[in-house]
């Protein structure tokens, strides 16, 4: 297993990590309700994906408590 021979300085570490970036999620429009949604996922507004309605995708404001 590779082990670093010398300690990497703080500036070199930060310069190396500066290239790590999160990519923004690509949004598409829902064909049914025209709301923005993520690709390959059911619409959070109407719950449709590929012409089918999924009840689990519909969000509710009420939170169930046990």
Curated annotation (Swiss-Prot):
Taxonomically, the superkingdom here is Bacteria
> One Pfam family from the UniProt entry?
Ribosomal_L32p
Q: Does the keyword Ribonucleoprotein apply?
A: yes
Q: Which InterPro entries match?
A: Ribosomal_bL32, Ribosomal_bL32_bact, Ribosomal_zn-bd
Q: Which HAMAP family match?
A: Ribosomal_bL32 (MF_00340)
NCBIfam families (alphabetical): rpmF_bact
Name-wise, this protein is Large ribosomal subunit protein bL32
């Amino acid at each position: 297993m590779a082990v670093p021979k010398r300690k990497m300085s703080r500036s070199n570490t930060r310069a190396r990590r500066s290239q790590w970036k999160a990519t923004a999620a690509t949004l598409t429009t829902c064909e049914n309700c025209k709301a923005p949604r993520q690709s390959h996922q059911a619409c959070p507004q109407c719950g449709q994906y590929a012409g089918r309605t999924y009840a689990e995708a519909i969000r509710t404001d009420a939170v169930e408590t046990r």
